[in-house]
Design a protein with these regions (language model features):
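Active-site-adjacent substructure of cysteine-protease-like catalytic cores
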Residues: 12-15, 30-53, 85-137
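Noncatalytic regulatory segments and standalone regulatory/sensor domains
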Residues: 133-150
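Cysteine-nucleophile protease catalytic domains, especially the papain-like/related folds used
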Residues: 1-86
Length: 150
């Protein structure tokens, strides 16, 4: 059994919006001069005066990280889970072993240790940045930065 955890910082300046918090957590853990980068790069790129107001969001959530991060997108359809050869755990482990962070959406109704577990639908974004086979858990960040081994 093995374990792997990619660098991820919890103490980022924005935790309310995951589209900012997740990449900032990755970059803070991987950039030596993160505070300088934040002041010189992020604020210049994201806080633009648009029609007399400041616009924080961009259509591409990773836009401000260009040159620092790279992203790939693929969608998993529900019918793929019915395929006998499909191993989602193996795919996640493979991606982490090759230095990739996984970001997506989960319904927390089906995640033990979450407030919504078994009670109500709560679809929210998440980031997986590690795994521990011995304890059969993934290291993840999610809503409100409640960290649990899911």
């Amino acid at each position: 059994m093995s374990e792997r955890t990619l660098p991820f910082a919890l103490d980022v300046p924005c935790i309310a919006y995951h589209n900012l918090a997740f990449p900032l957590g990755i970059m803070k853990a991987n950039i030596n001069n993160f505070d300088e980068w934040l002041c010189n790069k992020l604020i210049d790129c994201k806080y633009e005066n648009n029609y007399g107001r400041y616009n924080l969001f961009d259509s591409d959530i990773w836009d401000y990280a260009k040159g620092v991060t790279q992203t790939q997108s693929f969608h998993i359809t529900p019918d793929l889970f019915n395929c006998n050869a499909f191993d989602i755990i193996g795919i996640i482990r493979y991606m982490i072993d090759h230095g990739n962070y996984i970001m997506g959406l989960l319904n927390e109704k089906y995640l033990p240790m979450k407030n919504a577990y078994g009670k109500y639908d709560f679809v929210h974004d998440f980031l997986i940045y590690g795994y521990d086979d011995n304890n059969r858990v993934f290291r993840s960040a999610g809503f409100g930065f409640l960290f649990s081994d899911e």
